[in-house]
From Swiss-Prot:
One GO BP: protein targeting to membrane
Organism in which the protein naturally occurs: Dictyostelium discoideum
Name of the protein this chain belongs to: Putative ZDHHC-type palmitoyltransferase 1
Domain of life, per lineage: Eukaryota
Cysteine pairings via disulfide bonds: none
Catalysed reaction equations from the record: L-cysteinyl-[protein] + hexadecanoyl-CoA = S-hexadecanoyl-L-cysteinyl-[protein] + CoA
Active site: 145
Length: 434
């Protein structure tokens, strides 16, 4: 069973119009690194070429420098294409109802597998992936760039390319003028020192040429594999640099997280149903056992107060269930079973008291009927001889008393057996349930 972390690491600003990742330190370092080479270039290098080229070297350099900052900020604070999370349900995490890990779909006559994300509770679309840093599933996930501080996905891939190309052109611009300045200064130095020779720096590039050729060959072989998303070079260029503005679904994710905090828990929603069940059980116990009326009424009032304290929903909506709420629900079921155990124990105690009272009543009736039986026996045995009548009366009385004592002992033994059996069953139920 999965135990997803429901909190997302994504941060939002200005009513969810700006969406960014959690790592802000790298983003600040990237801003500083972009500032360091530009200022010395404008101060020390550009004035040397102003007399040979034109003054346009300043605005061109500043334009690409500012463009790099704009595209960097836009990429860092744009929703990369976060997919809204699914609704959390107990049936999803049950072992018998767990979702399959993979499903096969058909995309342009090509079968592909989509994977179930246990954190977001959804099947990821094709070319989507889960970012472990932001803790979100992102459409067309490319990578998580720490220097930008955000994921690179479907909605900010265009601005990320603009940032890379503007920054790359700015680096080439600065490095080109710096190399030109070095060449000019070295030429002046050679004029003053004819014996000096130029350095040779091409050995490292030749060593890397073998790796580059092998990598290009592997790309050439892999491009002929089956890919349902493969397009022409022009179509790929248009899709990368001039894509449509895709909608953002992150607001639905925020609304879903808001519902998780405002809607009451399932324990409180199902409180009325549990109370009705308890009331029916208590009413049945009241009809059977008159001695437990006060206890059952107190239990009913406590259950009703506990059910109405949390609030209920009128529209019958079942909210998402997070793992802490699942534990609350399990605890509520345990409480419900304990309440049923208490009611059953009370009913068994009532039966025990009833058996005891019935035994006492039977013993009292036997003791009252004893003199009556003796008088009847004396009246029926009329004889002429008083001695024989008295002996007969004594003998009959002794016999009757012995029989009566035997009956009383048998009745006591039977009642004691029933009481002992009921007490043993009650103790057995309490030990098992506890």
């Amino acid at each position: 069973m999965s135990r997803p972390s429901y909190a997302s690491a994504t941060k939002t600003y200005f009513h969810n119009r700006l969406v960014t990742g959690p790592d802000r330190a790298y983003f600040i370092v990237a801003m500083i690194l972009m500032l360091i080479p530009e200022i010395p270039f404008l101060i020390f290098v550009c004035p040397l070429f102003e007399e040979w080229i034109t003054a346009a070297i300043y605005p061109v350099s500043i334009y690409f420098w500012i463009a790099s900052y704009i595209f960097l900020i836009q990429t860092a604070y744009t929703d990369p294409g976060i997919i809204p999370r699914g609704i959390y349900n107990d049936d999803i995490f049950a072992p018998d109802h767990r979702q399959p890990l993979f499903k096969k779909i058909t995309v342009k006559d090509t079968k592909q597998e989509i994977k179930w994300c246990e954190t977001c509770c959804l099947y990821r679309p094709p070319r989507a992936n889960h970012c472990g840093i932001c803790n979100n599933c992102v459409e067309r996930f490319d990578h998580h760039c720490p220097w930008v501080g955000n994921c690179i996905g479907r909605r900010n891939y265009q601005t990320f390319l603009y940032f890379l190309y503007s920054l790359g052109f700015l680096c080439i611009w600065i490095m080109g003028f710096c190399v030109a300045h070095i060449c000019i200064e070295s030429a002046r130095y050679r004029d003053n020192h004819p014996s000096a020779s130029s350095a040779k720096v091409f050995q490292e590039g030749m060593n890397k040429s073998h790796y580059i050729s092998d990598y290009n060959y592997s790309l050439w072989v892999s491009r002929f594999n089956s890919n349902p998303y493969r397009k022409s070079a022009f179509a790929n260029f248009i899709e990368a640099f001039c894509p449509p503005r895709y909608p953002s679904f992150y607001k639905y994710t925020l609304d879903h997280e808001k519902e998780l905090t405002t809607i009451p828990t399932p324990n409180n929603i199902n409180g009325n149903n549990n109370n009705s069940i308890n009331n029916n059980n208590n009413n049945n116990n009241n009809n059977n056992n008159n001695n437990n009326n006060n206890n059952n009424n107190n239990n009913n009032n406590n259950n009703i107060n506990n059910g109405n304290s949390g609030g209920t929903t009128n529209n019958g909506y079942t909210p998402p269930i997070s793992p802490p709420q699942m534990l609350q629900r399990q605890s509520s079921t345990i409480r419900y079973s304990l309440d049923n155990l208490r009611t059953s124990s009370n009913s068994s105690l009532g039966n025990f008291n009833n058996l005891k009272s019935s035994r006492d009543l039977n013993l009292s009736t036997i003791s009252e009927d004893k003199p009556k039986n003796l008088s009847n026996s004396n009246n029926n045995n009329n004889t002429n001889n008083k001695n024989t009548s008295e002996d007969n009366n004594h003998s009959s009385g002794s016999d009757f008393g012995g029989d009566e004592e035997n009956n009383e002992d048998d009745f006591k033994s039977d009642n004691d057996k029933e009481i002992n059996s009921s007490s043993l069953s009650l103790n057995h139920e309490l030990q098992v349930n506890v």
